[in-house]
Amino acid sequence: MSGKENTKNDLAWEKLFDRYNILEQIESKGKFVISANQIKEEREPRLMTKFDHHINLPKIFLKNKLAILPITRGDYAIGHFDVYHQFEDEKMDITRVQLPDYVQSLNVDNITSEAMALNAAVASGIIAEFLEEEQSKLVSTVSGRMSSGSFSFHVNHVYKAEPNYCLQVNRSQIEIDAAYEGINFLSLFEAKRDLADDFLIRQLYYPFRLWKEKVSKEVKTVFLVYSNGIYRIMEYAFGDIDNYNSLHLVKQQRYSIEDTTITMMDIQSVLKNVDPVPEPDNIPFPQADSFERVINLCELIKSSNEELTKNKVTANYAFNERQSDYYTNAARYLGLIEKTYNENREPVYTLTSKGMSILTSNFKRRQLEFCKCILQHRVFANALTRYLKTGIMLTKSDVVQLMQEAKIKGIDEETMRRRSQSVLGWISWIVALNNET
C-alpha cells in the first residue's frame, strides 16, 4: 500500500476488504454495506468509522477513492461517495466582542473545549449577531446524541459531479454540538478546535434532515472553528434537501473576544530585541507550511485529557502520518513541545513550560511570543529583515540562499527548496499579524 507504516485502522480495513471482497462488491453493485458486528471482528466500530477529514481515511479507502457513511445504528455503506467539503479560503476582518462584565467563570485565555468556546460565543453575543437573532430571545435547545430518523438522499459519485448514489438512512446515530433557537430560526452547530482543509458534510446534513422535518421554522446549519483566540463561523445551506452535495456557503465571519490589535512596530520590536539561538540538534529544519496549524497542534496537546501519541495525533486530527511528523517536529524546533516515549516505545508529546506559558497568555502577548520563537532562528530573522527592507516577499531561491548562508546542516539544496515554503509561510503569518489601520 505504502512505504509508510500502516496504522491499526489501515491493517484492520485491509483484512475486512479481503475477507468480504469489498472492492469487487463495490464495482459490481455500486456500494457495499458492512455491519458493526463485521467491523468488530477486527476493531471497535467507533475507532474504524470516524473520519472527520478526508486525510484521516484508511489507506485502502484513499487508494480506491472510497468513503463510508452510517445508514443505520449498526450498518455502514462504503462506496465512491463524495462526502467531504473544502473550506472556503477567505481572509476576513475580525470583529471584536466582549464578555459581559459580570461573567467571571469564563477565562478567554484558557478556552480548552468546544463546549467552552460555544459558551463564550453565546455570552459575548457572537452567536446572536451571526445568526441575526435577538440575544434575549435565543435559547439553547437540542444537543448531544440522538437518532437521525428516516430519510433517503442522493450523494455524488467521487468521479462524477452528479448525484449517482441513493442511500436510505434509518435511525443512524447523530450528534449535535449545539442548537440555538430564536424567533425565526433553529440553528444547528458543529464545533471544532482543530484546523483542517475540509469537513465531513454528514455532520451538518444528517442533523439538518432530522430537524427540517420536526420544526416549521427555517433550519440553519453552522460550522464553528475556534483556534488561537479567533472564532471562524460559517453558515451553510442545502439548495436541494435531497442532495447531500448541494450545500453552499451562505456567509462567514471571524470574531474575537480578545483585543487582536498588533502593529508592525510591535513586530519590529520583537525582531530588534530577539536573542538568536543555535539550530537544535536532532530536530530537522521545519517543513510545516501553516504556522496556524503549528499553534493549533500545541493547543490540542494542551487540552488533551489523555497521553497524546503520534498515532493519536494522526487518527484524531487532520494530519496524515507524515504531517504528524512535520508539525510535531516544527513545534519541537521552536521549543514549544517535547517528545518522550511511553512504555510501548511510542512517541508521546507534551507542552514544554515555555509552550504552556505562551498558550496561557493573552492574544497579543501570545502572538508576539510565537514571533520571538520563530525569529530566534537566523534564517527566519534574516528573511523578515529582508522583507521589511523591500516590502516584497522573498522567493524560494532567496530563502535557499539564506539557508545556505546559515549553514543549515543535514539537507541538500532540493530539500532546502521544499522547506523554504515553510519559511515563507511563517514569515507571511508574522506579517499578517499587523492589523494597524
List the predicted regions and their residue ranges.
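Nuclease-adjacent, charged terminal/linker segments that flank catalytic cores
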Residues: 1-111
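Long, mid-chain structured domain cores
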Residues: 71-154, 331
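Phosphate/oxyanion-binding active-site loops and adjacent basic polyanion-contact surfaces
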Residues: 110-117, 167-174, 199-203
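Short, hydrophobic/π-rich interface segment
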Residues: 191-215, 393, 399-407
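Glycine-rich, often proline-containing surface loops adjacent to acidic residues and nearby aromatics
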Residues: 97-98, 175-191
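Nucleic-acid nuclease catalytic cores
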Residues: 185-187, 192-199, 211-241
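Active-site metal-binding core of divalent-cation-utilizing nuclease and nuclease-like domains
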Residues: 135-179
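Donor-sugar nucleotide-binding helix/loop cap in glycosyltransferases
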Residues: 245-437
